[in-house]
Design a protein with these regions (language model features):
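Glycine-rich beta-alpha loop segments
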Residues: 4-97
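PLP-dependent amino-acid enzyme catalytic core
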Residues: 7, 26, 32-35, 54, ...
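Solvent-exposed alpha-helices and their adjacent loops that cap or buttress functional pockets
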Residues: 32-34, 63-65, 88, 105-109, ...
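Short beta-strand segments
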Residues: 42-43, 74, 97-100, 137-138, ...
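Acidic/glycine-enriched connector segments
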Residues: 55, 78-136
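Short gly/pro/ser/thr-enriched loop/turn and capping motifs at secondary-structure boundaries
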Residues: 101-106, 143, 171-174
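Active-site/ligand-binding-proximal alpha/beta "capping" segment
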Residues: 118-171, 213-221
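C-terminal functional extensions of proteins
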Residues: 167-169, 174-221
């Protein structure tokens, strides 16, 4: 006789999960509602302190604060820590929107506001809603995820256009941009004008100049 396996009440558990999702939205709205104009900085969590990449992210955070922006990151180590450190040391708002992951370090020590999310989609919503621009430093899958989320929302007109700036001075993004232009555009997978959503800069000063000369939308989207 086959043993009966009790059914898992997936529907019930999913229904209760709604309250956790709502609570994360409410907490994010309440904590970030008074945030001044802000720029989100994304990059590698693996950049070691003292490395060239870490130093660039630190200078990015400092430059953005000096230009009048708060800095928002994923709140973790590496480039995120560096950008938050630069922002805080420059006397600015330094926000971390962390994600709960197994075996992940806690928030970095350079935050003036720290939030933690269980759900990636809630966290992404906060980045888009409360940032006037995305600055994309060299990074891995997580960095690419945030970048493609932004350009997809802009492409599909689910949000007003805002600057998405790829930063490198060593050709890190060249291969990706070549693939977008010579494969996606060439094969008709995206429109010829879509690559223009992405801007490029070599230095923090160039990023600030792009923000200064670009009509940046209000944070509420």
């Amino acid at each position: 006789m086959t043993e009966q396996v009790p059914a898992i009440d997936t529907l019930g558990r999913d229904s209760w999960r709604i309250f956790r999702i709502l609570s994360e939205f409410v907490e994010g709205f309440e904590e970030l509602a008074a945030l001044p104009p802000a720029v989100a900085v994304f990059g590698s969590a693996r950049s070691a302190r003292g490395s060239r990449d870490y130093q660039r992210a630190l200078e990015m955070g400092r430059a953005l604060v000096e230009a009048g922006y708060a800095v928002v990151t994923g709140g973790g180590p590496g480039d995120m820590e560096a950008a938050n450190r630069g922002a805080k040391e420059a006397g600015g708002e330094s926000i971390g929107l962390a994600i709960e992951l197994p075996h992940e370090e806690g928030p970095n020590p350079y935050l003036t506001t720290s939030l933690s999310f269980r759900y990636f989609f809630v966290r992404k919503f906060m980045f888009v809603k409360y940032s006037q621009a995305f600055v994309i430093l060299p990074g891995g899958f997580g960095t690419l995820d945030e970048m493609f989320e932004a350009i997809t929302l802009i492409q599909t007109k689910k949000t007003r256009p805002f600057p998405v700036v790829l930063v490198d001075d060593d050709g890190f993004w060249d291969g990706l941009l070549d693939w977008i232009e010579n494969t996606l555009v060439a094969r008709g997978k995206v429109s010829a004008g879509d690559p223009a959503i992405l801007r490029r800069a070599r230095t923090p000063a160039e990023v600030v100049e792009i923000l200064r000369t670009t009509k940046v939308p209000e944070k509420a989207r």
